């Protein structure tokens, strides 16, 4: 997983609250067997409307989504995070996230930054008044900068550490590779063993 320290990109004002995972990516797209290529599925129902924010320039090139409260509610769906990342988003700002979405985001390298709703409102106005405005999300200082607006954001220390180090679940496991190898070397031969992956 790529490390996240600081990202600057076009901000996208999504004035919508209670955006659930089925709105982020409808269930029909969950039949795919790969982890990539979901950008066409992101907000697919809403993108049929020509006035939707991602159908407008320069917002269609955005990488920082500024959403309303209660983003990512509904079912646990890693595909929702994959779709956001495949489209090009690196961070989502909201005053409240569903816990399961926040957890999935941190494991996949998408920053879910919890920003006070008053600051979200100010950022929305800035982005709407000056489309194409860049938003900088700095994970080290836990701040968001948009024009003259500087706002703090909240994120738990563990998720912040994982993002700064670029550690997904596999990366975390591989930090203990030497211990795992040493344990398996002493494990009785009649017990199951982990075999190396075959590369073809």
Swiss-Prot record:
Pathway(s) this gene product operates in, as recorded in its UniProt entry = Amino-acid biosynthesis; L-leucine biosynthesis; L-leucine from 3-methyl-2-oxobutanoate: step 2/4
- Record's catalysed reaction(s): (2R,3S)-3-isopropylmalate = (2S)-2-isopropylmalate
Q: What is its EC number?
A: 4.2.1.33
What species is this protein from? Pseudarthrobacter chlorophenolicus (strain ATCC 700700 / DSM 12829 / CIP 107037 / JCM 12360 / KCTC 9906 / NCIMB 13794 / A6) (Arthrobacter chlorophenolicus)
Classification via HAMAP family = LeuD_type1
Family designation: Belongs to the LeuD family. LeuD type 1 subfamily.
Protein name, UniProt field: 3-isopropylmalate dehydratase small subunit
Recorded hits in InterPro entries, A to Z, give: 3-IsopropMal_deHydase_ssu, Aconitase/3IPM_dehydase_swvl, AconitaseA/IPMdHydase_ssu_swvl, IPMI_Swivel, LeuD
Look up keyword Disulfide bond and say if it applies: no
Per UniProt, the keywords (alphabetical) are: Amino-acid biosynthesis, Branched-chain amino acid biosynthesis, Leucine biosynthesis, Lyase
Q: Known Pfam families for this protein?
A: Aconitase_C (PF00694)
Q: Name one GO biological process term.
A: L-leucine biosynthetic process
Recorded hits in CDD domains, A to Z, give: IPMI_Swivel (cd01577)
Tell me the enzyme class. lyase
GO MF annotations in UniProt: 3-isopropylmalate dehydratase activity
Q: Sorted alphabetically, which SUPFAM superfamilies does this protein's record hold?
A: LeuD/IlvD-like (SSF52016)
Q: Which residues form a coiled coil?
A: none
A cellular component term from Gene Ontology for this protein is: 3-isopropylmalate dehydratase complex
* Reported function: Catalyzes the isomerization between 2-isopropylmalate and 3-isopropylmalate, via the formation of 2-isopropylmaleate.
Subunit structure, briefly? Heterodimer of LeuC and LeuD.
């Amino acid at each position: 997983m790529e490390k996240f320290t600081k990202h600057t990109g076009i901000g996208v004002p999504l004035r919508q609250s209670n955006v659930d995972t089925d709105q982020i990516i409808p269930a029909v797209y969950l039949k795919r067997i790969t982890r990539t290529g979901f950008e066409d599925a992101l907000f697919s129902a809403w993108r049929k409307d020509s006035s939707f924010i991602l159908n407008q320039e320069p917002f269609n090139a955005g990488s920082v989504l500024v959403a309303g409260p209660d983003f990512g509610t509904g079912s646990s769906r890693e595909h929702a995070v994959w779709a956001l990342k495949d489209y090009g988003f690196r961070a989502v700002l909201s005053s409240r996230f569903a816990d399961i979405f926040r957890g999935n985001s941190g494991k996949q390298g998408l920053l879910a930054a919890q920003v006070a709703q008053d600051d979200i409102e100010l950022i929305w106005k800035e982005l709407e008044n000056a489309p194409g405005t860049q938003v900088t999300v700095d994970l080290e200082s836990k701040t968001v900068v948009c024009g003259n607006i500087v706002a703090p954001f909240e994120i738990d220390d563990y998720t912040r550490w994982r993002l700064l180090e670029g550690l997904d679940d596999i990366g975390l496991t591989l930090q203990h590779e030497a211990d795992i190898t040493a344990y398996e070397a002493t494990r009785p031969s009649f017990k199951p063993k982990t075999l190396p992956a075959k590369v073809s």
